[in-house]
């Protein structure tokens, strides 16, 4: 959870210099050639703070693992939460080791997709008219990484209530990011609560034309229960794959690389050297 919300909006001194250096590295990586993408929709749901074994104790989550793709050897890249969200969306933790809000350079997946004219939206449960930084709990700005880049809330970040109409309409965004609130992501509530939420949201996605026409849904957990191993569950839900299991070593950078390849854009930061999760994707 973000500490102090907007108390440390500015990144100062040596930290700012370090971030600028990291931004330069991330930007240079973004020019790497991308795999030719199929015109499919990509969905990402990020849950919270449970190990793979804990997540699989929930019946609906376990049923997805039995039916679709499972990354058995997938690890988050840091503790606490925020650096993992940044890794998933920019290919870097930016050297951060806390859950506070920081203004980072606009070198992220959202900016990348906007510049490439690829449609995208990030659906945040609990987001209100008070915006990305000031919406009340159970919304958490620390679980909304797109608000960090450039220090502002992009127009693409919207309340989760807009997902249903977008899925049922003719123009579902090519990239869909979904953040549950702090109860439904199991940060503050039992795994069973998050499992029920997933049943509803995954059902809505897999019933949509966007998913049925070749869409791919990734479900991951930002970090485990603070162990050094940081082993988390990541599922790949797509038609035509059946149950698949991969023992390859994957991380959040692998997931970002896979998403960028599917959307036809270059890889950012450490995603540039990551192994994509192609063995769990439909051919």
PLM regions: where:
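Core hydrophobic alpha-helical transmembrane segments of single-pass membrane proteins
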Residues: 19-21
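Flexible, surface-exposed loop/gating regions in the mature catalytic domains
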Residues: 33-283
């Amino acid at each position: 959870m973000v500490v102090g919300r907007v108390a440390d909006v500015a990144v100062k001194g040596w930290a700012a210099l370090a971030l600028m250096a990291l931004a330069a590295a991330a930007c240079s990586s973004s020019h790497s050639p991308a795999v030719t993408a199929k015109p499919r929709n990509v969905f990402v749901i990020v849950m919270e703070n449970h190990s793979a074994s804990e997540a699989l104790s929930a019946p609906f989550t376990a049923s997805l693992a039995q039916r679709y793709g499972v990354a058995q050897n997938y690890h988050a890249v840091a503790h606490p939460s925020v650096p993992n969200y940044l890794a998933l969306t920019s290919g870097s933790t930016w050297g951060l080791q806390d859950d506070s809000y920081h203004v980072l350079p606009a070198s992220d997946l959202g900016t990348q997709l906007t510049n490439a004219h690829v449609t995208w939206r990030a659906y945040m449960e609990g987001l209100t008219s008070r915006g990305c930084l000031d919406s009340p709990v159970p919304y958490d700005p620390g679980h909304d990484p797109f608000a960090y880049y450039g220090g502002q809330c992009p127009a693409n970040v919207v309340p989760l209530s807009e997902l249903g109409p977008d899925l049922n309409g003719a123009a579902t965004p090519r990239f869909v990011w979904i953040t549950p609130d702090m109860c439904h992501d199991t940060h503050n509530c039992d795994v069973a609560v998050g499992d029920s939420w997933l049943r509803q949201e995954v059902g809505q996605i897999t019933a949509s034309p966007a998913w049925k026409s070749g869409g791919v849904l990734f479900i991951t957990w930002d970090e485990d229960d603070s162990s050094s191993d940081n082993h988390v569950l990541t599922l790949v839900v797509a038609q035509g794959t059946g149950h698949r299991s991969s023992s390859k070593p994957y991380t959040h950078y692998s997931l970002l690389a896979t998403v960028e390849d599917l959307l036809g854009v270059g890889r950012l930061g450490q995603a540039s050297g990551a192994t994509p999760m192609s063995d769990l994707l439909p051919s």
